[in-house]
């Protein structure tokens, strides 16, 4: 089996340990820093692995998912590890699961974001955000069901995957991964009644801003814009999870959502 390994720069030591364990079992096509560009990984079909392992945190997995077409396996070396199915201490289990292809294929759809600075693909979210020195900004959101106006510091447009990230911290709802919808969540809105809006994934929305703001896609600032179009992309990404994976357990463990507490306060 052909596999590749990407790692975050400051996790090269544990990544090398993963490499040493895997190399006697699989054909390792590459072992590379995820912050660098390697277009041949995507473009050269003869070089394409059957799976790629990402050693790092959620940010590393996000970068890797955008580099490759094949499924990605996250090995947690960071903090939360929403995208990670394995710990560094579980590499032996990962080897067996790879040999038997014993995984849950967790497929997630993403957003296509069109703007004057380019076309981008958001796995978690696309954020329109004013600068610190700017006054409050007016956002106009046009869709099939009408036009909505927001007076806020910014807007977060998130996928179901991203609904448990930045949007959740802003008070937005968690959208289950299999729900065909995305959400718009305002940042520091002027009116307290302004809350998240959940939109069918069939919608294509146009967002117009009263002043130039930063467009941030999955945490990366890509430029200044006044207008963007957002819709569901035809592409999907695939994460390989252990057979024991389920979403409800993940959000309980990672962020404490929906945990049951006993009378003494313990879980």
Question: What are the roles of these predicted feature ranges?
Answer:
Residues 1-51, 55, 63-67, 87-106, ...:
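ATP/NTP phosphate-donor binding region
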Residues 54-59, 155:
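Glycine-rich phosphate-binding loop
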Residues 57-60, 78, 161-163:
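Short glycine-rich anion-binding loops that position phosphate/pyrophosphate groups of nucleotides
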Residues 66-78:
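Gly/Ser-rich helix-loop-strand patches that form or flank binding pockets
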Residues 78-153:
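Catalytic core of DAGKc-family lipid kinases
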